Amino acid sequence: MGAAMVMVMPPYHGATFRFGEAQVHGFFQAVSDAIAIPIMVQDAPAAGTPLSPAFLARMAREIEQVCYFKMETSGAAGKLRELIALGGEAIEGPWDGEEAITLLADLQAGATGSMTGGGFADGIRPIIEAHRNGDPDTAFALYQRWLPLINHENRQAGFLAAKALMKAGGVIACD
């Protein structure tokens, strides 16, 4: 037993301290050299290091384990679309992030999964499945049903909402 994948952000020391592409590439190369499982690059504003679609696609082609990407930046759908176009088969898993706030746009751009805060995977999965099965109307209707909770978790409560849902569902014992 063990991890099937790791999610890694570029090294950072606060949102104003940035690393160059060579340093970020070297960091991900070192992680890849040390493990034998896929790496998901988390492209999040907290890292402070901009990661262009061209650079991410290059890392996917050049670094063995780098093949999944979680987009949490503004303009995520456009970035996913460009990453998929530039990276081709090297992009195994382009994913939506940020609590699914842009899920439908990201799915339309080519995202194949989503990593939300974790509180309502049972609500997100049917949206993704409906989209994958070519039923955008059902995906939209399901998304609208879950959107108030998505917005609440994303903009108001964060992990507190996820923990409350997990406690209510019997996944964890405390909040």
What are these regions (language model features)?
Residues 171-175:
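Flexible C-terminal active-site loop/helix
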Residues 29, 103, 163:
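Short glycine-/small-residue-rich flexible loop motifs, especially phosphate/cofactor-binding loops
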Residues 45-157:
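Catalytic alpha/beta core domains of metabolic enzymes, predominantly
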Residues 16, 79, 164:
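Flexible glycine/acidic-rich beta-alpha junction loops that bind and position SAM and/or redox cofactors
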Residues 1-48:
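Active-site beta->alpha loop and helix N-cap motifs at the rims of alpha/beta catalytic domains
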Residues 153-168:
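Active-site pocket-lining/capping segments in soluble small-molecule metabolic enzymes
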